[in-house]
Structure formats: C-alpha cells, structure tokens
C-alpha cells in the first residue's frame, strides 16, 4: 500500500474486495511504474484472476500488422508482465483517436482481424476488441493523411454518442476466433508460423481430437497448403467454423488441408455457427429537434431489409441509408421506427 505523510493507504485493499469475478486496470507506462506489482494485486483480488493492460505488447502487435508481418515472435512478446495477467488488444481507443503511427489509415479491417486472431486464440491473457466508429476514416489535421492538428482525425461524423460502432466484431472470422477461444479454455497453446511470416498458426491442445484445434491466419494472396506442417494436435480431422473446410492430422503432421488466401480459419471439433446478422436504426431514442430527425438504417449480413415508421413511411433499405422522421409529428408524439430483415441463417 502507498504511504502518504507516514499514513498507510488501504484504498486498494478496500476497493478490490467487491465480489467481481475478474478485475483489471489500465496502467500508464512510464519509468519506475510497478506494472508487475499492479498486475499481481489485481490478479489476487478476484476468484477468476485479473491483471493490467499490456500496452507494450499491443504496440508490438500493431507494429506487426501495420507493416504486414505475422511473425510469431510479435505475438508472444510480454516484457513487463507475465502473459496470464495481461489484458491485450490490437488497438485501443487511444491508439485510434490520437493518431499513433497513422494507425487509423494504415490498419485495415483485414489486418486488424489477423492481429485479433493471433492475440485471442492463445491461452493466456484477456482480449479486448476495440470497435471503431461506424464508417471511420478521415485524416489528421489539414496536411493530409498522417498529419495531426486541426482536422477531424479519424472521425467522419457518421455516428453519434450512443450509436453502434463498426460491424467488424460481427465478422464471421472474428466470431469464429472468439468461439474458438471460449471452447479451448484451460488448454495449452503454441504459436508458430506456417511456412512464412504471412501465415500465423495458434494451436490449442489437450491430447484428443475432441479437444484440440488451431487458428490459422493466412495473409498471403494465395491459398496456404498446410500438408507437411508440424503440429501438436492429436490425430484426427478438424473442421473450420468459417468455411466448413477440414484438415487432417496424423503423427504430428498435417496430412491434408488448406486455408484460403487472405482469410482466417478456426479448425476444431467444437464448431458452431459463426453467422451474426443485424438490422438496426440509429439513433434509437431521443427527441426530435426542430422539424425532423435523421435516422441511419443499418444492416449486416441481412437480406430483404425493410423499414416502417409510425408516421406512415415504409420501404426497403441497404446499410447506411437514411430517412427523415417527425416532420408530421405532433408535439410530444412518439415516432417509432421498425426494421426487419432475413438473417444469414435464414431467420427473420
């Protein structure tokens, strides 16, 4: 505990005893900051552990994906805190908003997903996925891409406070990696490259085909044939949640199976549907200032999307379309917007 003027503080002893299952804190890295001590403090204060944000690890991962390199060492570099007590990310809200190394411009959705696969498929650490604003973009300042100053930054004003952000977290590859992580709790992990630094493989294994699996991020422009690749997985056949393709393992080697170019595969025998579909309208509540209010209609992996309003409007829409409501509304009248669609699995 910290000591001030000869008096000992019991702040942490008091505040952390709150019944939470898992707790973590953000420690701003600087000289003489006791990251390991803070991580141990949080980890010992909750029954399911805890830790701190590992900003230096995130920086290493961003360097890798920003410069299009999936070398395994970039995803195993925890220098200040043991990996079981870390909270990890590809990028945080600060990295995105503050213009760190031109990140908003230079990190595409594709490479964010590769980074997420490498971070999240592993055994240790807790992962956080930063959901960028809807239709993010823009440049920093007035000097063009990469400058920081008086410009709009990466925010394009397509969303307002309280609106849903990017749909990337619903992407089937992101969802499959999340499912994989949850299914592999407690199993050992191994991170390696499959032939080159643009193909990253995270294996999880416990000794049987019913338990084992691997996530492969293939950033190459062509398919990656995994035949001959050494593996710790048990003998058997494993199915990719995203595409349904399979790999076969025998005697510590992959004997057959490929991963499509520029894609992520999550092979296991614990697969489940990774399809997420949504139809939404934003903002989803509030008052109507002046004569009308603009509503943005959103859809993701949905077809036959339609809208109707209680003030008499209706029609079909595609993601990003806008409508105006309230022009005929009386004072204090509530205007309701209803959106519908057919999901990727055929559900209404």
Model regions and ranges:
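Active-site-proximal helices and loops of the catalytic beta/alpha 8
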Residues: 2-273
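Low-complexity, disordered linker/stalk regions enriched in Pro/Thr/Ser/Gly
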Residues: 274-348
């Amino acid at each position: 505990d910290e000591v001030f003027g000869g008096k000992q503080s019991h702040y942490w002893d008091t505040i952390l005893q709150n019944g939470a299952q898992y707790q973590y804190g953000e420690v701003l890295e600087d000289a003489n900051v006791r990251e390991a001590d803070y991580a141990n403090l949080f980890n010992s204060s909750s029954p399911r552990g805890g830790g701190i944000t590992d900003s230096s690890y995130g920086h290493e991962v961003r360097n890798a994906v920003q410069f299009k390199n999936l070398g395994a060492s970039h995803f195993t570099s925890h220098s200040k805190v043991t990996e079981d007590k870390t909270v990890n990310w590809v990028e945080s809200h600060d990295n995105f908003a503050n213009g760190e190394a031109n990140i908003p411009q230079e990190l595409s959705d594709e490479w964010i997903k590769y980074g997420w696969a490498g971070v999240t498929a592993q055994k240790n650490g807790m992962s956080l996925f930063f959901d960028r604003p809807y239709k993010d973009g823009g440049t920093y300042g007035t000097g063009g891409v990469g400058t920081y100053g008086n410009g709009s930054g990466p925010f394009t004003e397509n969303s307002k406070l309280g609106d849903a952000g990017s749909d990337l977290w619903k992407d089937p590859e992101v969802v499959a990696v999340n499912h994989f992580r949850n299914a592999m709790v407690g199993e050992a992990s191994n991170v390696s490259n499959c032939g080159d630094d643009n193909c990253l493989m995270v294996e999880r294994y416990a000794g049987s085909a019913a338990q084992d699996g691997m996530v492969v991020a293939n950033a190459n422009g062509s398919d990656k044939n995994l035949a001959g690749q050494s593996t710790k997985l048990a003998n058997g056949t494993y199915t990719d949640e995203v595409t349904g393709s399979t790999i076969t393992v025998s005697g510590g080697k992959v004997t057959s199976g490929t991963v499509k170019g520029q894609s992520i595969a999550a092979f296991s025998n614990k697969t489940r549907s990774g399809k997420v579909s949504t139809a939404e309208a934003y903002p989803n509540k509030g008052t109507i200032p002046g004569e009308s209010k603009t509503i943005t209609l959103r859809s993701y992996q949905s077809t036959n999307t339609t809208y109707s309003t209680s003030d008499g409007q209706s029609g079909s829409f595609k993601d990003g379309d806008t409508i105006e409501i309230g022009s005929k509304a009386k004072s204090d009248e509530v205007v309701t917007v209803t959106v519908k669609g057919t999901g990727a699995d055929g559900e209404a």
